[in-house]
C-alpha cells in the first residue's frame, strides 16, 4: 500500500489517477498511523515551500516524514514535494526543509520564461531502479520556478533550462522528481510502475525478517 500524503498543497487527484492506472494499491491520507503502516510514501506538492513546511508542521508530518525517510521505506517527492526533501529553501524567506537530502532550493535565474513550464528533455545520469524501461532523453513535464542546488552524486536526471536543473534525485530509499511523472505520459507511468516495484520489494524484505 502506497500512502499519498494529503496536506492540502498537493496535486493529489492526478497522482491518485496515475496510481490507479498502473494498478497500485494506495491510500490518500494525512493520518500518521496510516502513513507508518504503508509500504511506501508519495509526497506531492504545489505552491510555496514555507507554507508547505508550516502545514506539515501543523499536522505533525515533519517528524513522520523524517522517520519514514530514515527507515529505508521508499519515499518519492514530486515537484514541491521533492524540494521539501532538501535542507532548506530560499523561496520568499530562508526556510528549513525535511533535511533528508543535502542541498538548497534556489530560484531559477535564467533568460527564459519563469516558471519553467512544459515538456523538457531528461538526460539520465547513472542508473537506478526507477530508470528501468525509461530511455535516455525522454521528455517529461515541468512546472516550477525553483530548483535544487545539490551534490552531483544524488542527481540521476538533468534537464537544461539555462541552468542544469536536477530533474531527478535519489539517495538510498529517497527519490525526488522535480517534474510531474503523473503528467508525463507513458514515460512517467513507467517511472511510477518502477517505484511501485521498489515498494513491493521493500514490503517483501520486511515480511522475510
From Swiss-Prot:
Q: Which domain of life is it from?
A: Bacteria
Q: Which residues form the active site?
A: 79 (nucleophile), 180, 182
Q: What is its EC number?
A: 4.3.2.10, 3.5.1.2
Q: Which residues cross the membrane?
A: none
Domain Glutamine amidotransferase type-1: residue ranges: 1-205
Q: Where in the cell is it found?
A: Cytoplasm
A molecular function GO annotation? glutaminase activity
Positions of disulphide bridges: none
**What is its pathway?**
Amino-acid biosynthesis; L-histidine biosynthesis; L-histidine from 5-phospho-alpha-D-ribose 1-diphosphate: step 5/9
Recorded hits in PANTHER family, A to Z, give: IMIDAZOLE GLYCEROL PHOSPHATE SYNTHASE SUBUNIT HISH
Function, as annotated, reads: IGPS catalyzes the conversion of PRFAR and glutamine to IGP, AICAR and glutamate. The HisH subunit catalyzes the hydrolysis of glutamine to glutamate and ammonia as part of the synthesis of IGP and AICAR. The resulting ammonia molecule is channeled to the active site of HisF.
Q: What is this protein called?
A: Imidazole glycerol phosphate synthase subunit HisH
Where does this protein come from, organism-wise? Bacillus cereus (strain ATCC 10987 / NRS 248)
- Gene field: hisH
Amino acid at each position: 500500500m502506497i500512502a499519498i500524503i494529503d496536506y492540502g498543497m498537493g496535486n493529489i487527484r492526478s497522482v491518485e489517477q496515475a496510481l490507479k492506472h498502473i494498478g497500485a494499491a494506495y491510500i490518500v491520507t494525512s493520518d500518521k498511523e496510516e502513513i507508518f503502516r504503508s509500504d511506501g510514501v508519495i509526497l506531492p506538492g504545489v505552491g510555496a515551500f514555507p507554507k508547505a513546511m508550516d502545514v506539515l508542521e501543523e499536522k505533525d508530518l515533519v517528524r513522520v516524514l523524517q522517520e519514514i525517510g530514515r527507515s529505508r521505506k521508499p519515499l518519492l517527492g514530486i515537484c514541491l514535494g521533492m524540494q521539501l526533501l532538501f535542507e532548506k529553501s530560499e523561496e520568499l524567506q530562508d526556510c528549513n526543509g525535511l533535511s533528508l537530502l543535502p542541498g538548497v532550493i534556489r530560484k531559477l535565474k535564467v533568460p527564459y520564461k519563469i516558471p519553467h513550464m512544459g515538456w523538457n528533455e531528461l538526460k539520465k545520469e547513472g542508473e537506478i531502479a526507477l530508470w528501468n524501461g525509461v530511455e535516455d532523453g525522454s521528455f517529461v513535464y515541468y512546472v516550477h520556478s525553483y530548483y535544487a542546488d545539490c551534490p552531483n552524486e544524488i542527481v540521476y536526471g538533468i534537464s537544461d533550462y539555462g541552468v542544469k536543473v536536477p530533474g531527478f534525485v535519489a539517495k538510498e530509499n529517497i527519490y525526488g522528481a522535480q517534474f510531474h511523472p503523473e503528467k508525463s505520459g507513458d514515460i512517467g507511468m513507467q517511472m511510477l510502475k518502477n517505484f511501485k516495484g521498489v515498494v513491493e520489494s521493500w514490503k517483501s524484505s520486511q515480511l522475510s525478517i
